[in-house]
Amino acid sequence: MLRNGNEGMSTIPGFSQIQFEGFCRFINQALAEELDKFPIIKDPDHEIAFQLFAKGYQLLEPSIKERDAVYESLTYSSELYVSARLIFGFDVQKQTISIGNIPIMNSLGTFIINGIYRIVINQILLSPGIYYRSELDHKGISIYTGTIISDWGGRSELAIDKKERIWARVSRKQKISILVLSSAMGSNLREILDNVSYPEIFLSFPNAKEKKRIESKEKAILEFYQQFACVGGDLVFSESLCEELQKKFFQQKCELGRIGRRNMNRRLNLDIPQNNTFLLPRDVLAATDHLIGMKFGTGILDDDDMNHLKNKRIRSVADLLQDQFGLALGRLQHAVQKTIRRVFIRQSKPTPQTLVTPTSTSILLITTYETFFGTYPLSQVFDQTNPLTQTVHGRKVSCLGPGGLTGRTASFRSRDIHPSHYGRICPIDTSEGINVGLTGSLAIHARIDHLWGSIESPFYEISAEKAKKKKARQVVYLSPNRDEYYMIAAGNSLSLNQGIQEEQVVPARYRQEFLTIAWEQIHVRSIFPFQYFSIGGSLIPFIEHNDANRALMSSNMQRQAVPLSRSEKCIVGTGLERQTALDSRVSVIAEREGKIVSTDSHKILLSSSGKTISIPLVNHRRSNKNTCMHQKPRVPRGKSIKKGQILAEGAATVGGELALGKNVLVAYMPWEGYNFEDAVLISERLVYEDIYTSFHIRKYEIQTDTTSQGSAEKITKEIPHLEEHLLRNLDRNGVVRLGSWVETGDILVGKLTPQIASESSYIAEAGLLRAIFGLEVSTSKETSLKLPIGGRGRVIDVKWIQRDPLDIMVRVYILQKREIKVGDKVAGRHGNKGIISKILPRQDMPYLQDGTPVDMVFNPLGVPSRMNVGQIFESSLGLAGDLLKKHYRIAPFDERYEQEASRKLVFSELYEASKETKNPWVFEPEYPGKSRIFDGRTGDPFEQPVLIGKSYILKLIHQVDEKIHGRSTGPYSLVTQQPVRGRAKQGGQRVGEMEVWALEGFGVAHILQEILTYKSDHLIARQEILNATIWGKRIPNHEDPPESFRVLVRELRSLALELNHFLVSEKNFQINREEV
């Protein structure tokens, strides 16, 4: 991206910048805006006035470190001090008071709330303003409507009916004449007719009765209130009626806000000042005029495209935090008013400090924020699976959430890619499933204009006049409503020097159409081939050779890759790996130059300008997804370092580059059906040499409570009735020792809960004690923390958190080492995913002509139908790179250089590798990229040449250890009496419709009957079956129906249908009627 040396250099912006910019705007502007709105609290009886000032507010440094907040489950926050003034009679007091704590964003762009990293996603919403649309009714007549959307998301509609009357629909039920609405908003009929372009249409529809209703503002308000609130009878005009209307209608439906006012002025060509943020009668009349123009053909028939990004706005972290701050200040106002009343009852002299007390009033701020972060749908637990996930999570944009769409009701059009998304929202990166198209990711060069909430994309200006004025071409950021006026050359730039004219005719984008036009007519040009993609999409090499659906899967699966114990750089990459790793902040970067004094696994000591600085390292810390975060020092003692150099590397990074997987030797061939339907065959080398071994940390916690009788639980090693073997790892306090190896069922923390025995269970001696001395004999129940199934591992940390003597929480962290095994999920970077089906001894794997056994065998049938041919280019180029000891970083869309550029590159590198290593099999002209390989079991060559190569394969977080599950007995659902669902609840395996068909196909009637009735929901039979199975007896037959049949009968009864069944006696054919 450089040109003429360093002149006019363009770099990719910081990936976390969007979150930081939003938070800075909140701190610098939004806090002052909300404090300005805080009213003066007056108490007229006692001549008291309390006021907060926005000027000169201060935020203190957080009182605890980020690490301690996570360790002790606290909120990382900063105290806010504001100037306050209290007028009491003739006494004026000024003080700087603390009004509470505000959560502070850390260097990852996240917040720490109660010890958990959380992040706020950017929401994309319909912008406030007016939108017009026309649609045909069932008779084929065009209906024109205008929708006014307020800043709060409230909607009002303007419509013209068949009789050419104009109505305003203020909610779903009621519609009100436009004249009544305008009059209620303060206009008289004369003003209305003076301010519209079609007065004759306005005069044509009201009859005498309606004209009477709008004679005065009071009558119009009464009429409006009657229709809006659906109230009948005679109403009398009053102030309270006006207040109710103000609160219920005007505040919710008529506040346009700053963005809405700008949109309204633009759409209707008005010149109302920006500070008029409410809907005015002038707006309503101008909107109605436009609607009449559309209906009667005098206006332009321009339906608004609701999916165009110019009609959308971004609600960033700043907007959401500002709303919550306003809410907290509202609560603070009520609390201060209560305190003022209390002060006068006690007749004490108030000060600003006594009105805002830390215990009752200023706690409102932090509780408001903690509630927001805990319950708001767009506040999510920060995904820390790997460094890529940490970088990408803050760049998500979502249409879901309050005021937005829902996954069940969103239309296809609102999910689709729109031409205005180019360079702003990635056309590939979105979630799979019900939310497809509703959550997206920002393109790598996109930025958010926080003032107006639009997404901007950068372009190079290449217009002739500007080129004369300035030698250096300038980068312009275009918002979605501006780029419609430009001819934009698509990303076809060959050179990074954008002054070069490339071809006479180029493909371009203009007004959402794709054209081919002369180079002279181009205004701006895209600056980078990656410009249209998100980070996930930009990490896929040869993405232009893949189907978009597979690229989508790939960008999602890279976020699920587990950091491996020994990471490895990819041979074939795109060049974005370094910046992704850097912006994820998992590595330690030198902030100043100096000399390394010493390094160990916990800290690095750096001597810089006479001072020794200690730089702490992350050591086996658990992430939110149970992966292991760990930093390893990469600088030797005594080495001089420069500012910006890497001192220690985090998980899944090598040499400052992202390293999510491993380069392994793969072959595309079928092998005895073991790679049928995306299954993958692997060599035991991947297990024994710890190639795909990862570390995972599980957290287990237990808390002591006070029982209903008032006695406290206690943590102890002295637990009766338990085998010594289960308690072997406990120290004298009853907590597991650091470094001990624990297995399933072992006690991690011993705990006893006291219980008062019931009267009947007393022994005689206890009765005597109670009668003579009044002593209660207590018994204890064992409620220890046991290690659940699949939790075996090494204890690496134990935490005691003691808020008060009786409330103790103990957390135990256990490290697990997991090798790759059958059932684990692996994936490439092209959406080629599969499950490990078999681990073969290396001598049985197919081997190359130089005797090297293959590491993985993929099914070749997974490539043609899925059209992800990029994996073939990657594996062949990876083989050449491995042999030549080279790494490649390839920008996408290299076919713009020449036809078949990717293929030519791969073949030339394979030829080079063949020459260099003197191995003719690496590149054979008859079948380039393929080679004859041998069956490891027999030593015979396979019939056809096979494609081999080095691919970069990731191990995903979907691991068999966390999925596999079995149940013999367990909990049942209360209503249907069938086993509950899910591994977490120790549930059963559902036999559904298709499984029943499969069993029916084999005619196994008895097995079907057992599965569907006796074993499932027959209350008596299921206990007897267990007994019969253990003793090898015959399963008894039961005549009464299973529980699900009873549920059906009860449901029929609720519909007034009685259902009974009859039993016919075999002896005398008497009918015995029994109730179900």
From Swiss-Prot:
NCBIfam families: PRK00405.1 (NF001616)
EC number: 2.7.7.6
Role: DNA-dependent RNA polymerase catalyzes the transcription of DNA into RNA using the four ribonucleoside triphosphates as substrates.
Main location: plastid
Catalytic EC class: transferase
Molecular function GO labels: DNA binding; DNA-directed RNA polymerase activity; ribonucleoside binding
UniProt-listed SUPFAM superfamilies: beta and beta-prime subunits of DNA dependent RNA-polymerase
Protein species of origin: Agrostis stolonifera
Localization terms from the record: Plastid, Chloroplast
Pfam families recorded: RNA_pol_Rpb2_2, RNA_pol_Rpb2_3, RNA_pol_Rpb2_6, RNA_pol_Rpb2_7
Superkingdom assignment: Eukaryota
Lineage: Eukaryota, Viridiplantae, Streptophyta, Embryophyta, Tracheophyta
A single GO cellular-component term on record: mitochondrion
Catalytic activity: RNA(n) + a ribonucleoside 5'-triphosphate = RNA(n+1) + diphosphate
Subunit structure of this chain's protein: In plastids the minimal PEP RNA polymerase catalytic core is composed of four subunits: alpha, beta, beta', and beta''. When a (nuclear-encoded) sigma factor is associated with the core the holoenzyme is formed, which can initiate transcription.
Example GO BP: DNA-templated transcription
Name used for this protein in its record: DNA-directed RNA polymerase subunit beta
InterPro entries: DNA-dir_RNA_pol_bsu_ext_1_sf, DNA-dir_RNA_pol_su2, DNA-dir_RNAP_su2_dom, DNA-dir_RNAP_su2_hyb_sf, RNA_pol_bsu_bac, RNA_pol_bsu_CS, RNA_pol_Rpb2_2, RNA_pol_Rpb2_2_sf
Family: Belongs to the RNA polymerase beta chain family.
Keywords: Chloroplast, DNA-directed RNA polymerase, Nucleotidyltransferase, Plastid, Transcription, Transferase
